Amino acid sequence: SKRTGPVQTNNLQVNSLGIYKNSVFGTTTAHFVTQLELVNTNPTIGTNITIDPVKDSVYLYIPYFSHLDEDATDGNTYILDSIYGNKESTLNLKIYRNGYVLRDLSPNPDPTDVSSYNQKYYNNEKGLVESNKVNIQLNDNSNTAENTAFKFSKEQYVKYKTNENGEWLDSNGAVTTDTEKRIVDEEFKPGMWINLNKQYFKENILEAAQSNLINNNNFKEYFRGLYFQIEENSGQDGVLAMLDFSKGKIHIQYHSDITVTTSVGTTTTNDKRELELNLKGNTINFYEYENDAIYQNYQTQLDNANEITGDKQLFLKGGEGSVVYIDLFGTDDTQSVNAEGTALIAGSNDIPDELDELRIKGWSINQANLVFNIDN
């Protein structure tokens, strides 16, 4: 087994968030940062902007991987997929505005390597974002399930139809306080549902200079995204989820005045309005490894790997972990194959001699098996 060293973790399709505790590899904490994009650029937001604490909302929604429970009778009970650890464990989730520029292109590319022009970020570069975050926690709701006692819930979220005043409506469009008569506006599969700081988004999105909202290049330079920071809660087993953050969105519902001038005259209306942001653009997944006794023992095993005769135990770990090398044909390379491909001759050719011999004899391998036993 050999260490991988830091690994590139930007712009992955699926990312990790949470804490995972393993009896062999120790504790891994996964954080995440992403850019945001306006769904509709250069929006008409209006004037006299308000976000009413009751009537309006600013929320973040990111769906989890899930499937319907076929054994349930209600038809809308879900089972979460890609969740590791104790699903009932809580985490201390903090969401901040990112202040670090997530570049598309590397400032120092190698002209001989086309791939070097794309910016690469690695799992151990959390400090870049941590030291540049805007130190105002955005998920500051009084509901601790959205911050200090966050957990990956399998519950659906249901949004009900409301009027301009945020009151529920029944099937006739009349105001109702009866929870049985209210009408469903939208159903959301299980996901991260976080109410964000309304005042902050009013001041920094709705009241931003129009030049910052005119296109997504300007917007991503102005508002550099969200940083999801994870902290462990004492006494918890830990839980980690795989998420497709690109399916997430921020929904801002507010009220404002918009003035329209026609040939008939000028009218100003104050109405409920909406603005949406997608969690799209550049991303980085950060991993931290707790330097405890378990982790140190794992590192010692890697330090003492025997590259000559091999090891009885092999350690395979993703992220900044370890890989396993299997040497099938030995390291001897004192011979090569003649021009006709019929005999071995003196001189190395960067191919193991045993493999050269198999090739010149034309032997075929019909079946080969490698059997690994996993230690519990």
PLM regions with names:
Residues 1-376:
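Secreted, disulfide-rich extracellular signaling modules
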